[in-house]
Amino acid sequence: PCKLLSHQKIDEFYELKTSEGKIKTQYLIIATNGYSEKDIGNEHYNIIGVPSYIAATNILGQEKVQKLLPKLRMYSDSKNDLYYFRPSPDHKRILFGAFPVWAYGMENSKMVKSFFYKKINIILPKIENFSIDYIWGGKVGVTFNTLPMVKKTNNKIFVLGCNGSGVALMPYLGYQAANMITTNQNSNLVISKIKNEKNYFKFFIIKFLPLLGWYYRFKENLENKFL
């Protein structure tokens, strides 16, 4: 992989300057998702990167994991501040995911580890005597209208904004991107015809993400208590 430094359209081609040299191409596919910044153009105002993390427990053993998750399925809740978890493929650990919006670039911090430890204890109170061996994270691309962006403009093809469903969506959206190149036409998907919402206060929103996260947790705690 190499880092994109800049790109510009010259006649019928795009010239890309990267950390490894220059590239000249007729079509430019932008699939930056949660890592969309100013260098992709004004479209970066359509999307924001939200931190997403996964933690892996120590080896608990198949018997204990089976007791904690009897059907060995993937579980997810329906809250705004949601969690999801599942057994590892060998059924010896538990993998636990969350969106701690305050935790930009803090995979190895004690705060993130403590956060996961507390949440796993709350959701799986019978787990007892466990530790967290690994934590990794990145950014989920969330659009302001919560729909993926799939469009072609001046031979620049945008495929981004999966809102946390990238594993399921991106193979198909990648097919759509390739199809736009081979047919030299825009996608016929309904979402490609919907106007994407821009938010020019994006950078202020990023600063206030921790506050928004706290608001949703507070709101859901009240709902759980009184509804």
Predicted features along the sequence, with ranges:
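Active-site substrate-recognition segment that forms the wall
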Residues: 6, 22-154
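C-terminal catalytic lobe of FAD-dependent flavoproteins
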Residues: 102-109, 114-221
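A generic structural signal for beta-strand entry/edge sites
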Residues: 11-15, 91-93, 156
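Residue-level detector of beta-strand face positions
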Residues: 15-17, 149
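A conserved short coil-to-beta-strand element within the FAD-binding core of flavoproteins
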Residues: 1-14
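A hydrophobic C-terminal alpha-helical subdomain
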Residues: 225-227
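Short secondary-structure boundary segments
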Residues: 2, 32, 185
